[in-house]
Regions:
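N-terminal start-of-chain detector that recognizes signal peptides
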Residues: 30-36, 44-47, 102-108, 163-170, ...
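A contiguous, surface-oriented mixed alpha/beta subdomain in the mid-to-C-terminal portion of proteins
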Residues: 120-271
């Protein structure tokens, strides 16, 4: 039987990790849900670069500050505020039928959210092999009577194969995202971001800092060979998707305002 992953800081959402095993979890099942309670009070979600075109239509895309910058989808402008999912983890932008089943959703849910509660992890620090693990505290996986099987005998079910493939693709997307950020840094295109919003009736603007964004002025001043490189690599439309998405910050602010969750004018770190 595979041993548990070695102790290390757990990623966002995860409370614990166990390797998925046909010996231990032979009778376990996955049950569907339209709720994501683990999202409650989370305002910044990791995003892969290839998701930028879809995500920019709905949410601001920023980068975390510091040398280890990562792209983040902003679900709120303040710690603990999520304007797209309610406290029960249900999407607020959906149309439901009389039974409460979602029949239409215009919202893009980032892959990082869809991946949970699964994760590819190294069971030993020096191992090169990644094993499919899961968070045992999740309420969607367990020894249920209902739901889809994880194993057929001692073999992974079609569902488990699909989960494994999704996680494999996510890891590859993560590597491409890290390379994208590195190239932005090599070109010195990331700068400290700041957004100032003057709300009606407020004596001071609401100022949000503590994140990074692409410096559009420097982008426009790139040398011909540098610009040609990011055009040929496919980076340029992704950069503009990020820049276009920043207009969504005001929409998120308006949503927070309607929810009564605007913190008084101050400096706020969203990342």
């Amino acid at each position: 039987m595979a041993s548990a992953p070695q102790p290390q800081p757990l990623p966002l959402f995860y409370n614990d990790l166990q390797p998925l095993s046909s010996q231990v979890h032979a009778d376990w099942r996955v049950r569907p849900t339209d709720r994501a309670k683990f999202l409650a009070n989370h305002h910044a979600i990791p995003l892969t670069v290839e998701e930028f075109p879809q995500a920019q239509r709905f949410m601001p895309i920023i980068f975390s500050s510091g040398p280890d910058a990562v792209p983040l989808a902003l679900f709120g402008l303040n710690e603990g505020v999520n304007v797209f999912f309610d406290e029960e983890g249900q999407l607020t932008q959906v149309i439901r039928d009389e039974q409460g089943t979602i029949i239409e959703s215009s919202f893009y849910v980032p892959a990082y959210i869809r991946r949970y509660p699964y994760l590819l992890a190294r069971l030993q620090p020096n191992s090169e092999e990644l094993s499919l693990c899961f968070d045992p505290t999740a309420d969607t996986i367990g020894a249920f009577e209902e739901g889809d099987k994880l194993f057929e005998g001692d073999q992974p079910s079609e569902l488990t194969k699909a989960i494994l493939e999704f996680n494999r693709q996510f890891e590859e997307a993560g590597q491409r995202t890290a390379q994208f950020v590195k190239e932005l840094q090599d070109l010195d295109l990331l700068m400290e971001g700041e957004v100032s919003i003057q709300a009606d009736g407020a004596s001071q603007p609401f100022v949000y800092r503590g994140f990074s964004m692409v410096n559009e002025e420097k982008l426009n001043q790139l040398r011909g060979d540098q610009l040609r490189k990011i055009v040929q690599s496919g980076m340029l439309p992704l950069i503009y998707a990020h820049l276009f998405s920043l207009s969504q910050i005001r929409e998120v602010f308006a949503r927070q305002q309607r929810m009564g969750k605007i913190v008084g004018p101050q400096l706020v770190n969203p990342a």
